[in-house]
Amino acid sequence: MGRVEDGGTTEELEDWDPGTSALPAPGIKQGPREQTGTGPLSQKCWEPEPDAPSQPGPALWSRGRARTQALAGGSSLQQLDPENTGFIGADTFTGLVHSHELPLDPAKLDMLVALAQSNEQGQVCYQELVDLISSKRSSSFKRAIANGQRALPRDGPLDEPGLGVYKRFVRYVAYEILPCEVDRRWYFYRHRSCPPPVFMASVTLAQIIVFLCYGARLNKWVLQTYHPEYMKSPLVYHPGHRARAWRFLTYMFMHVGLEQLGFNALLQLMIGVPLEMVHGLLRISLLYLAGVLAGSLTVSITDMRAPVVGGSGGVYALCSAHLANVVMNWAGMRCPYKLLRMVLALVCMSSEVGRAVWLRFSPPLPASGPQPSFMAHLAGAVVGVSMGLTILRSYEERLRDQCGWWVVLLAYGTFLLFAVFWNVFAYDLLGAHIPPPP
């Protein structure tokens, strides 16, 4: 709690909580008269226009002035505006933003600076400063900017010709992934190349290395699962090795053959990397690994005799989340040939599922045992439509503030607990006949 003196009275203020403050009502302008109170913000006051309706009491304006004082860090308005014009320069405002510890994350501070610099005169008036600091905001700062009609300039860098190769790629990613123009401009403005999208690239590289090692060792590059030695890998999930918990995740590094690896690697790079650039390593890695884990656990429940290989659970989680996001925001997406690309993606994904179904029910070789299950593909798609869509729709918003996120997280946690108990008790209770592990 803090206190500020204004006009001879002392107002007790709330802690800085942007969600509880309000925009100054219309009809208020900055008056020239001086106040007699102490404190730097008492040099100028808010004064209603002659024809304006009655306004709330001074407490509302005191809150705005107190929050502005927090930004000014003790500097008087006379020092910031020595000529008493009612404006401060954008450069001065930028220095204030970055030189004081405000309870806003760096991205939001950057947006404050961007809004200040978007002014044609390069100035910020006192009214705008109070609006920026004390305006009521939703859980997403950039949506508050949109609601408050404070977006980046329409002729911003997204439409500039002569951009470098990397900036053109960033613009392409913004158009491909984000459905809202405000989001696209916000992403383009604040994107930094460091850290790079290392997760999807690292996973893809590791999968290729593992495939090359086993291919060279077995001299088999297609349908490697028919080779009995391949299924003996400590990375493959097999129902006879359920106690080795790492196999529920590490199976994503093994693949049936070149055909499955090529399909998964292509989608991971074409869809996974742009998603990671926009939404960050933590969210996309969480979604990918959640799809992988759900895939192996679903197989352990629905196809108890089958092993699992391949990263299809994670790949289908990413792809289904992205496709669902495109469908739900069809009008706002700017990617070209949306319908054609959607149909092509669905055909390719369906073909991969068909290949996996054929492989699962094809007659196995005597020494190879049952072939890998296709249920991981379907489980990954379910994770993508539920958890993944929630993540993709929460761009620049904290997931913990989203009610849907907690619902999805609770459902996923319940599934995990059920799957763990199933793997511990159900196999023995049901007398499931499990093929001996290789």
UniProtKB/Swiss-Prot annotation:
The keyword Protein transport does not apply. One of its GO terms (molecular function) is serine-type endopeptidase activity. The chain crosses the membrane at residues 196-216, 262-282, 284-304, 308-328, 340-359, 372-392, 405-425. Its EC number is 3.4.21.105. Detected in heart, brain, skeletal muscle and kidney. The active site is at residues 312, 377. Its main location: membrane. Residues 8-17 have a biased composition (Acidic residues). It catalyses: Cleaves type-1 transmembrane domains using a catalytic dyad composed of serine and histidine that are contributed by different transmembrane domains. Signal peptide: none annotated. It is a multi-pass membrane protein. One of its GO terms (biological process) is signal transduction. Pfam families: Rhomboid. Keywords: Hydrolase, Membrane, Protease, Serine protease, Transmembrane, Transmembrane helix. It is found in: Membrane. GO terms for cellular component: membrane; plasma membrane. It comes from the Eukaryota. It is an enzyme of class 3 (hydrolase). Residues 1-62 are annotated as: Disordered. Belongs to the peptidase S54 family. May be involved in regulated intramembrane proteolysis and the subsequent release of functional polypeptides from their membrane anchors. This is Rhomboid-related protein 1.
